[in-house]
């Protein structure tokens, strides 16, 4: 009786392990899962940050700062959604680093927004340079994924 129970338990365990292996996320599957999330964020940023460069040039720093803060909130939401997507185990280290850069981008957008609202244009410009550098580092992590919308390009808006 104990042998039969042990065999059934082992068989069930092997079946579960096989299902887990079959359900392992692939790089292609990951890209398919995250691109719509990034697309939504990109489209939101196009609306939110569309005229921000002109606002800053015209000295309208408070509205530009408000736009940066909205973009920060959108990116933080996107970052949380991206973190919830199962990752391919072979790419977990790269994706973990990429997600940390994405999270940092949200913080930098927020810092730049606060600086603009406070009338600190030079400080905001310095933060935007840091933001662009951070985005480049993030993109380097996932170059092999051939992302379209998940390639972060803050320079399009700033």
Predicted regions: what is each one?
Residues 27-111, 123-152:
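Alpha-helical segments in soluble extracytoplasmic regions
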Residues 156-158:
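Short, solvent-exposed mixed-charge patches
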Residues 9-17:
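Bacterial N-terminal signal peptides
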Residues 1-8:
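Bacterial N-terminal signal peptides that target proteins for export
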Residues 17-30:
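C-terminal region of N-terminal signal peptides and the immediate post-cleavage residues
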């Amino acid at each position: 009786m104990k042998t039969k129970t042990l065999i059934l338990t082992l068989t069930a365990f092997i079946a579960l392990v096989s299902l887990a292996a079959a359900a392992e996320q692939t790089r292609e599957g990951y890209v398919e899962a995250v691109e719509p999330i990034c697309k939504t964020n990109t489209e939101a940023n196009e609306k939110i940050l569309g005229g921000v460069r002109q606002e800053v040039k015209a000295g309208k720093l408070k509205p530009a700062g408000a736009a940066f803060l909205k973009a920060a909130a959108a990116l933080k939401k996107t970052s949380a959604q991206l973190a919830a997507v199962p990752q391919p185990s072979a790419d977990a280290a790269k994706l973990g680093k990429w997600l940390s850069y994405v999270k940092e981008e949200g913080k930098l957008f927020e810092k730049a927004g606060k600086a603009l609202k406070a009338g600190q244009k030079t400080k905001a410009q310095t933060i935007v340079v840091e933001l662009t550098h951070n985005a480049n580092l993030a993109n380097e992590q996932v170059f092999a994924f051939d992302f379209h919308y998940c390639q972060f390009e803050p320079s399009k808006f700033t």
